[in-house]
Amino acid sequence: MSFLKSFPPPGSAEGLRQQQPETEAVLNGKGLGTGTLYIAESRLSWLDGSGLGFSLEYPTISLHAVSRDLNAYPREHLYVMVNAKFGEESKESVAEEEDSDDDVEPIAEFRFVPSDKSALEAMFTAMCECQALHPDPEDEDSDDYDGEEYDVEAHEQGQGDIPTFYTYEEGLSHLTAEGQATLERLEGMLSQSVSSQYNMAGVRTEDSTRDYEDGMEVDTTPTVAGQFEDADVDH
């Protein structure tokens, strides 16, 4: 694919946490070949035997998980969802965006399938640790409220404006199309939460993995259908 490039693999200088040889890379259901996966603090990279590969920046990774559902994919693997398009899909998405008024965020699904499935836990842990080093700037900004303070005393004297508050129903009407789509997606993810474990499109977080913001274990119980189905995962 055209997005595959030649570059030196990340080393200790980039904080290499995990190097997993004999790992097959799959993008949106299409195999890219077998190579080595490099999980470094700076980026997530994969290179095939010829030295061609790709790198993923952590801020673009919206979800990573260990998938053990053999109904969704025939082999256990590390699943990574990225907010971007790659290869031919990136060209198609540009054309679609020109014809569409909706601001739809691009999504790509990667599956990294190691020949040694026992390495999945170490791969998952390394991903969680590296992802934590790259917090979402939007989350940080939300902690610092820069808006004007509401002066109760001024309001009582008729000198201040009443801040606008919305009920749940009213708030929905003020959401943008993108906001509504995001809300619907999140509600769908949370609708199957059960006691201490939460099922989100086949992804389950348990107490042992709650410390990881973006990482989660996949539910292996047969009661959840459609876990990590291609092109409709989410997160």
From Swiss-Prot:
UniProt name for this protein: Methylosome subunit pICln
Keywords of the record: Acetylation, Cytoplasm, Cytoskeleton, mRNA processing, mRNA splicing, Nucleus, Phosphoprotein
Top-level lineage group: Eukaryota
BP-aspect Gene Ontology terms: cell volume homeostasis; chloride transmembrane transport; mRNA cis splicing, via spliceosome; potassium ion transmembrane transport; spliceosomal snRNP assembly
One GO location term (cellular component): membrane
Family matches, as InterPro entries: ICln, ICln/Lot5/Saf5, PH-like_dom_sf
Source taxonomy: Eukaryota, Metazoa, Chordata, Craniata, Vertebrata
Residue positions where Phosphothreonine is found in the record: 221
Entry annotated with the keyword Nucleus: yes
Effect noted on mutating residue 53 to A: Removes cAMP sensitivity
Pfam families per record: Voldacs (PF03517)
Biological role stated in the UniProt entry: Involved in both the assembly of spliceosomal snRNPs and the methylation of Sm proteins. Chaperone that regulates the assembly of spliceosomal U1, U2, U4 and U5 small nuclear ribonucleoproteins (snRNPs), the building blocks of the spliceosome, and thereby plays an important role in the splicing of cellular pre-mRNAs. Most spliceosomal snRNPs contain a common set of Sm proteins SNRPB, SNRPD1, SNRPD2, SNRPD3, SNRPE, SNRPF and SNRPG that assemble in a heptameric protein ring on the Sm site of the small nuclear RNA to form the core snRNP (Sm core).
Modified residues (N-acetylserine): 2
Amino acid composition bias (Acidic residues), ranges on this chain: 137-151
Localization per record: Cytoplasm, Cytosol; Nucleus; Cytoplasm, Cytoskeleton
